[in-house]
Amino acid sequence: MGKVGNIEHIEERAETELMPPSMYKVILNNDDYTPMDFVIEVLQLFFNKNEQEATDIMLAIHHQGKGICGVFPFGIAETKVAQVNQFARQNQHPLLCSLEKA
C-alpha cells in the first residue's frame, strides 16, 4: 500500500515538471543607421529566414519601429539576442536586438 502512495506522488510530481517553458519574442528595433541589407543578413543568419521572410520582417522593422524575429524559450531567446547584438557591434552597426515575454 505504501508503494501505491509513493507512485501516485511520483506521477503527480512528474506532471507538474512537464509544464511548457515560458516563451519570449526576439525583437529587432529600428534605427537610422543600420543598412537594410545587414538586417536581412541577420535574419537569415540567426533566424533561418529565407529571402522573402527576411525582407518582410525588415520592412516591418523599418515601418513599425520593430519586428518579431521569432518566439523561443527564454534560454534560446537570450542567446540569440546576445549573438545578434555582438554581431552588430562587430560590424559597427547600432542594431539593437531585445526580447519580451510572449
Swiss-Prot record:
HAMAP family: ClpS (MF_00302). Signal peptide: none annotated. Binds to the N-terminal domain of the chaperone ClpA. Pfam families: ClpS. This is ATP-dependent Clp protease adapter protein ClpS. Involved in the modulation of the specificity of the ClpAP-mediated ATP-dependent protein degradation. GO terms for biological process: protein catabolic process; proteolysis. InterPro entries: ClpS, ClpS_core, Ribosomal_bL12_C/ClpS-like. Belongs to the ClpS family.
